[in-house]
Amino acid sequence: MESDKSLLSAELNSEFEQALYEQMLLKAKQEMQNRLPNTPESKQIRPQPGFCIKTQTSEKAKIFINICKTNDIPAPPDLSEAELVNILESDDPSGYRVPMSIGEPHVEVDNSGNGCTVYDIVINSTFFDKMKSNELFREFFITVAMEGLENKYEMELSRDWRMLKNRKFMGSISDQNIRTKSKPIIQELDTSSSQTLQSKPLISEIQSSPKVPEYTIAAEPSEGHPSFLVAEISLPNVTSVRSLVLDLGEDRIVLWGRPDLYHLDIFLPYNIVQEESGAQFNRDTKVLTITMPVQTI
């Protein structure tokens, strides 16, 4: 396949090009950070109690999960039951995400006087009300919440759970720190050098039969533990940044180009600092460049 010279390559052919490439990356990163508003990256919230479920780990350890609510966390898209079923039956049901904050484990005492481990999970208040009154959404959310706990704390939870009656929470509910969403994640560039900042959508909608775009990922420096990663994604059919939905995980890039254009879901070789990452879409080259600082060892 003939390479596209508009894309930066991780393999440069000369020391001069290598030095020029590094200067461009560092300059772009510095400019993006200078344009970001100087606002707090996180804030402390006091969640409200909702309900509590009881389950256990694969080692039979008793686990309680407090499902809490707050207006400080955004709600997922408001779907009907039929729309949720269609998403769950699709090839990639992960496109529908529920924003949530998963707290640290804390030890409490149950009604029998025995010690137990409790986790607090906080979601949007409006979605909580819908989920609590709708069995399908409740089953879906609890499954997603358990998967979140399993991934974060590397454990296996039984799906045989029950909701506690007449008890909204186990133990005490602590304040949680949540990241604010004030930073723009995608910046649009054109020949006039004017840039339109777009907020990062938290959730993307499922599209049918999207195309996987061509991309490259470069590490800087190229040897040893890198300081940051740069991903370049070729999107020739995208005309505006408004059609892009970008979601950066700790070690993952998920990108949607709407309507029904592109879908990219890849894992990164290193964990990144999500809140310090940024992206630029160049309307001339149709290339989305994502600069991602790498977590230190």
Swiss-Prot record:
A GO cellular component term found in this entry reads: nucleus
Q: Does Chloroplast show up as a keyword for this record?
A: no
Output the GO biological process annotations, alphabetical, semicolon-separated.
box C/D snoRNP assembly; rRNA processing
Q: Which InterPro entries does this entry report, sorted A to Z?
A: PIH1/Kintoun_subfamily (IPR050734), PIH1_N (IPR012981), PIH1D1/2/3_CS-like (IPR041442)
Whether DNA-binding counts among this entry's keywords is no
**Annotated keywords:** Nucleus, Transcription, Transcription regulation
As for subcellular location, the record says: Nucleus
Q: Name one Pfam family in it.
A: PIH1_CS
Protein role: Involved in the assembly of C/D box small nucleolar ribonucleoprotein (snoRNP) particles. Recruits the SWI/SNF complex to the core promoter of rRNA genes and enhances pre-rRNA transcription. Mediates interaction of TELO2 with the R2TP complex which is necessary for the stability of MTOR and SMG1. Positively regulates the assembly and activity of the mTORC1 complex.
| Family as reported in the entry's similarity comment | Belongs to the PIH1 family.
Q: What is this protein called?
A: PIH1 domain-containing protein 1
Q: Which gene encodes it?
A: pih1d1
